[in-house]
Amino acid sequence: VFSFVSLHSRNVLKGPFSFTMALCVPENALRFKPSLTRTLMPRIQPRDAHFPTVQTLIESGVHPLLARIYAARGVRRREELDYRLSGLLPPHALHGATEAAQLLADAIEAGARMVIIADYDCDGATACAVAMRGLRSMGADVHYLVPNRFEYGYGLTPAIVELAARMEPELLITVDNGIASVEGVAAARRLGIATLITDHHLPGDTLPEADVIVNPNQPDCDFPSKSIAGVGVMFYVLLALRAEMRERSAFSNGQEPKLGDLLDLVALGTVADVVRLDRNNRILVSQGLARMRAGRMQPGVRALFAAAGRDAQRASSFDMGFALGPRLNAAGRLSDMSLGIECLITDDSARALNIAQELDSLNRERREIEQSMQEDALAQLNDFNPGDKLSACLFEKDWHQGVIGIVAGRIKEQLNRPTFAFAHGNDGELKGSGRSIPNLHLRDALDLVSKRHPDLLLRFGGHAMAAGVTIPEHRHADFSAAFEEVVQELLGGTDITRHIDTDGSLESAWMSLDAARMLEQEVWGHGFPAPVFSDKFRVDNQRLLKERHLKLQLSKNGQRFDAIQFNFAESAPAEIHAAYRLSANEYNGVTSLQLMFEHFEPA
């Protein structure tokens, strides 16, 4: 959801009803020139909730408000809201999971050394922690390696294989990477090292010749949950391994590993990686949240809640996506993701808290770097014409490679156009990170660019909404032109106006603290968004908090409400039409209802 807000915290309210509108992002404020802002103005539009479905859900015992929200998200039967573990898709349905279990069981029985090759984001870190904890619980001799992304690049490269070989492994296991590592797997094979690829990214035309590949998106895999995250794939491999070890009577004392204890990590990685929350993913997330709220979590997860100032007893998808996840990601962006992994695998609570506090400091540093880069990006967009351009490709020689993905995402949110941000890599290369909009599959677009310009893309990979690319240092302008050409073809004639989807007007009886708490307990995320409502209000009072957040007192149908819009430092008109969320706000030990505005406009 996108909002119109003022972007400079130093601005002050300019009179009772005057206001300036500009696009805002969740953390850092951005300002476009007024003509661009007007062109990019979004539209509030209600989702369609099929009335007979709403009635069916209500009759089956679903709360009327939730029934309306769920129906608008495609839920047809109450059974789809049953998030018990028994509802998970079976491990054998994931192509390669059974073979992976056999490979791992053989390695455990032989006492073979395994080395996990991890990715450097939250999904990769949680997948590595799940693998480390799960494999060790079944007796494996397992270690991990997460090479510096800036020195060794992404995936199982030949250089990483050479580095891992010093640890004398007999089996390399990738988590959240490896599906594009054709050369790396070949290098491991030459050294006599077996390879197990666990990944969820889209494969290229050629698969690596690994001993086993587990990836729901590989050819011949009919696993229904194509959106499972890398940590989810590894969790499924462990489920299959436990079943295999059970068949081999490896748990003769009856003490089977409790893999459910890893679901806090699975939930964290799933939400933070912004994969689509289909029912299978919602089960994983729901189970993880339930364990967090009950205090059953890894010491590192508990420490991350403390470092972020969040209450684990009220854990929500928001906490994982916007509080815990960014702190883990900060390690991979600015330092070494081994710091994040150590936080998740240590059983020492004091050590976990120390690491979490260090991660919090890194995240603060990341925000400062990001703010500077965003200012550079906006300067480059002074002459951007949304009437002519359907994409943006930005580059600055001093940009930090670990933060370009965030900047691309911020600018994409503002322009509602596919965006790449580039930074210097190694050996005369530029590293690019891209973010897309729903109408354009980013990896497919890159594949088309690659086929038309075979010498332009050195490497690329990713998903529909996010992708990475490496190009020669001097070819940025060529890439920008080639990418724009492909985007024009794929989006030509498509209405890409930004829309704020809402769940419509909220009845007065449900504008309550109880309703806010009820909604916070549910599972929300990408593809199953948290509810946003839209209503008209009268603004009775307004003031600035910390010179950057607009605090309002509103009235509607005789009721009064407190509301806030973050990163908004201009005044609201007397009558507004607002898109908002219900929030339980705690202040000085008192909890009350607060409306969190996503966007407002004159009524």
Regions inferred by a protein language model and the residue ranges of each:
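Aromatic (phenylalanine/tyrosine) cluster motif
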Residues: 2-4, 17-19, 32
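Hydrophobic helix-and-loop "lid/oligomerization" segment in the mid-to-C-terminal part
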Residues: 42, 46-171, 191, 209, ...
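Mid-to-C-terminal polyanion-binding domains and interfaces
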Residues: 106-110, 351-394, 427, 440, ...
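Active-site cavity-forming subdomains of large catalytic enzyme subunits
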Residues: 162-231, 235-252
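A short acidic, amphipathic alpha-helical/loop segment
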Residues: 183-187, 392, 407, 518
